[in-house]
Regions:
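C-terminal regulatory/interaction module of P-loop NTP-utilizing enzymes
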Residues: 1-434
Length: 434
């Protein structure tokens, strides 16, 4: 009985298969017929269009169509890169600092020469420089003033407004769209920057830095959308941004990132991995009088008419020029005391960070008002951003750290630690709660 049922089912399946084949042939013939009909109609339509055009040569529409067809093809002019005519090479450190201080003064801000040297050394030596502070402390305007002082603001400065919800590098560098077969630009200003630097490197005419400002950079986790560039922090001399279609942009250390971040609870934390690679400058609060009077205004300041060359900036402020120098023993002892103290708070200062501090100091000591001031800037911007802990024991560690800073005339660092202690809530202490 079961065998008979199986045989019946097989026969039924065979009949259905034959029917499917017959249906398939029927549909195939129908499709072929439709294709033939389409070709016939299409040919007839083309014939009628040609006949109509022949009989209506004087009509306005035909004249327009013919004129368009007879127009010569436009010649596409290649964008030939040329050398900068306003490039400034014969300038020394004092002159650059004087220009910077003047631009700040024009904007209603006063900075010391030490501050000016600090900004310049930080930007030249580091791949990304972070300006941290409360909203309204002038972080963004400071970055714009730096670009204007160096003559970069009009053509070699891109301001990127970071938004919430950025989750990958696509939000910054764009992506290849397989439907349009084109690179979709999510940040046009940055895409323009990459194209320009790629062309300059291909033609070997890189003459000036290009500053990219990530404004309110921690509205989204930086490590997510900046992942393409995190790799190049140690050696930015050959950077590559690649897309899935094989297209890529290549450029070098002329690209410098600036970032502004706010101290509040609505932003993403900076990871230890990022802090190990970045240089963080803490911004002092702006006085109420200055804010109310509206004296601070970077928009009234014009871009410097001359562009300070990349070669000049590197020759003056880069650490490679002092790589054979060594930190003096007194300064090394001071630094070692700070590093050892940080270990008590659970913070191991990496070899990378120590190298960055050393590089900064060896250049800064030549220009700043004292060796102590040079070391003070380095510690406050490379070591203190690591501060993040809680409890009575951590408070004792911070008090001890502040004492060491005071004993070694590291006044800026001592002041920062003091503010961290003052602003703590529920015995939670963080550099980014200043």
């Amino acid at each position: 009985k079961e065998l008979e049922d199986v045989q019946i089912a097989i026969e039924k399946a065979k009949k259905e298969a034959k029917q499917f084949e017959a249906d398939r042939d029927t549909w195939k013939r129908a499709c072929d017929s439709i294709k033939d009909e389409y070709r016939t109609v299409s040919n007839d339509l083309n014939t009628k269009i040609i006949e109509w055009a022949a009989n209506n040569r004087t009509s306005e529409i035909t004249k327009l169509l013919v004129s368009q067809l007879e127009m010569p093809e436009e010649t596409v002019e290649e964008n030939v890169l040329s050398r900068m005519v306003n490039l400034k090479k014969d300038v020394d450190a004092d002159e650059i600092v004087a220009i910077l201080c003047k631009k700040f003064e024009e904007a209603g801000r006063v900075i010391s020469k030490d501050d000016a040297y600090n900004y310049l050394i930080s930007i030249v030596q580091n791949y990304i420089t972070v300006f941290a502070g409360e909203p309204g402390t002038g972080k963004t305007s400071l970055c714009k003033l730096l670009a204007k002082a160096l003559g970069l603001y009009d053509s070699r400065f891109a301001e990127i407004l970071v938004e919430r919800g950025w989750t990958s590098s696509k939000d910054l560098v764009g992506y290849y769209n397989p439907l349009t077969k084109e690179i979709e630009s999510t940040q046009p200003r940055f895409s323009e920057c990459m194209k320009k630097l790629n062309e300059e490197n291909a033609n070997n005419i890189v003459e000036a830095p290009y500053l990219v400002l990530l404004d309110e950079a921690n509205l989204s986790p930086i490590e997510f959308y900046w992942s393409n560039f995190n790799y190049y922090c140690d050696d930015p001399t050959h950077q590559v941004v690649s897309y899935s279609n094989g297209e890529k942009y290549e450029f070098g250390s002329e690209l410098k990132f600036l970032a502004t971040i706010n101290y509040d609870q609505t932003t993403a934390d900076l990871s230890p991995r990022f802090l190990d690679r970045a240089w963080v400058i803490s911004m002092n609060p702006v006085s109420v009088d200055v804010i109310v009077s509206g004296l601070m205004d970077d928009s009234v300041v014009e871009n410097n008419s001359e562009v300070i060359s990349l070669e000049t900036l590197n020759n003056i402020f880069d650490w490679h020029n002092v790589k054979d120098k060594k930190m003096n023993q007194i300064t090394k002892t001071r630094l070692d005391r700070i590093i050892d103290k940080m270990k008590e708070g659970g913070h191991t200062i990496s070899a990378r960070s120590i190298h960055l501090i050393s590089h900064y100091y060896l250049v800064a000591e030549m220009f700043m008002s004292s060796k102590e001031v040079a070391l003070d800037y380095a510690i406050s911007q490379k070591i203190l951003p690591c501060i993040n802990g809680n409890g009575k024991q951590y408070k004792e560690f911070l008090n001890g750290l502040m004492t060491i800073c005071k004993e070694n005339q590291l006044n800026k660092s001592a002041s920062i630690v003091s503010k961290i202690l003052e602003k703590s809530e529920h015995e939670f202490y963080s550099f980014f709660s200043l």
